[in-house]
């Protein structure tokens, strides 16, 4: 069966950016920026995005476009006879399943909060205990979380079952355009609040005193880690979209566009969070506490807060769901490519697997709340394995596969990367890609354990 292509370049860019843009852009990037010197951190982040993120992204896309296959078969198509690079393809699929085992339930939380703001569960004037109580009640109710999980899983795999152009590309285009419009509207509203200037200063103005306290080395390694992790590279989440590309555009140019969209959302998210928090005297933090406790506390005390809260969680639903359907597509393509299944059958099987695989994460907040390994609950443990092990190790494998004679080889990668119109990768960068970039990835890997 002939492989589908994206209907348009815009579709490819929005689907790929949707995969990269996710919860971390909102609940991690702004906080890490503020804590690490503001504007100076952003400059380091952008530098490492160019030095690390874009090159590895081109490698995933190159393997996909050259092979026209999903992760496992892409290695088998391009590797030398009797080599074992395709083992990493299987690890990529394990990583995608593991990522969705905790990411899908969290996407359900976003949808739940959108519903609760829209229907008036959050009322003007609620105190902080009442706001926290809504989140605590959700965490204590496996039934409620399972309902939202089921909605995300069913709708996500239904979109994938429709095919590339009629399903994921069509839906992602609508969601991403709406997401970009929503984030701009929300940022403008936040920047018009009373003490917005203080929040913007904390967020973006370089604070050399804070850099001195934190340590320049810590700022640099934090920027390096954020630039690496923001794209989710190493488990073939982007490789699959390379396999649907045509040869019209260079991969380096397309990678720059994807990273630009991802960075835009991450930076503008901070323009929502910090002005709002400083205007209402709330300490900005990170993670679930920021999204589900701190910001709802702001919204319930804001004029028109129900509307702004509804729009914010609609934005967060789109941000998380765009990643969900992108990775779901990888899982569906894995079964269709590797085992010759139809899209419908692959979507149904994956939907059943994913629903039950997500239950441990949900139960980890209530009936299995005593479970921990090395002090980590179910969600944190799954996140640690994906983020600190599978992503950096996987990125290193893609790097070695594309730059060494034992893998696909630099010349093949270079030719694929530069095929088409657009920005070209310079051959001068070969020594950097072969000898320096691996060292940077090792630093990220080590930093993940130290941090």
Residue ranges of model-derived segments:
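Transmembrane helix-boundary motif of multi-pass solute transporters/channels
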Residues: 11-48, 236-242, 253-256, 260-261
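Membrane-embedded translocation segments of transport machinery
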Residues: 2-6, 169, 173-321, 325, ...
């Amino acid at each position: 069966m002939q492989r589908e292509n994206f209907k348009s370049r815009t579709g490819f860019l929005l689907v790929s950016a949707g995969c990269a843009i996710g919860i971390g852009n909102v609940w991690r990037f702004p906080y890490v920026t503020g804590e690490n010197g503001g504007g100076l951190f952003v400059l380091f982040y952008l530098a490492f995005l160019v030095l690390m993120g874009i090159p590895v992204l081109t490698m995933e896309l190159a393997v996909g476009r050259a092979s026209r296959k999903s992760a496992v078969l892409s290695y088998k198509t391009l590797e030398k006879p009797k080599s074992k690079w395709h083992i990493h393809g299987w690890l990529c699929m394990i990583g995608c399943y593991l990522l969705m085992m905790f990411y899908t339930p969290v996407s359900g939380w976003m949808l739940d909060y959108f519903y609760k703001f829209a229907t008036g569960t959050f009322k003007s004037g609620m105190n902080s205990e009442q706001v926290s109580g809504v989140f605590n009640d959700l965490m204590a109710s496996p039934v409620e979380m399972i309902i939202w999980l089921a909605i995300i899983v069913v709708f996500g795999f239904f979109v994938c079952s429709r095919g590339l152009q009629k399903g994921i590309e069509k839906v992602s285009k609508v969601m991403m355009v709406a997401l970009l419009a929503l984030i701009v509207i929300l940022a403008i509203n936040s920047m018009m609040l009373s003490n917005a200037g203080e929040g913007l200063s904390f967020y973006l103005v370089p604070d050399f005193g804070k850099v001195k306290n934190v340590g320049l080395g810590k700022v640099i390694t934090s920027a390096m880690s954020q630039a690496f992790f923001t794209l989710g590279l190493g488990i073939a989440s982007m490789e699959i979209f390379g396999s649907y590309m045509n040869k019209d555009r260079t991969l380096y140019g397309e990678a720059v566009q994807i990273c630009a969209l991802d960075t835009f959302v991450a930076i503008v998210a901070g323009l929502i969070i910090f002005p709002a928090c400083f205007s209402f005297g709330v300490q900005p933090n990170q993670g679930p506490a920021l999204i589900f406790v701190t910001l709802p506390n702001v919204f319930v005390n804001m004029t028109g807060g129900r509307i702004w809260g509804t729009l914010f969680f609609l934005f967060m639903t789109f941000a998380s769901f765009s990643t969900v359907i992108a990775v779901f597509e990888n899982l569906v393509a894995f079964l269709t490519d590797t085992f010759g299944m139809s899209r419908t059958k692959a979507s149904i099987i994956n939907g059943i697997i994913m629903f039950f695989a997500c239950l441990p994460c949900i139960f980890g907040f209530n009936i299995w709340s005593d479970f921990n390994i090395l002090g980590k609950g179910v969600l944190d443990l799954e996140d640690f394995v994906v983020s600190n092990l599978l992503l950096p190790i996987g990125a290193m494998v893609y790097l070695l596969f594309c730059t060494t004679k034992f893998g696909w080889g630099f010349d093949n990668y270079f030719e694929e990367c530069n095929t088409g119109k657009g920005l070209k990768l310079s051959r001068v960068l070969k020594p950097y890609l072969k000898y320096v970039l691996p060292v940077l990835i090792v630093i990220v890997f080590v930093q993940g354990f130290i941090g």
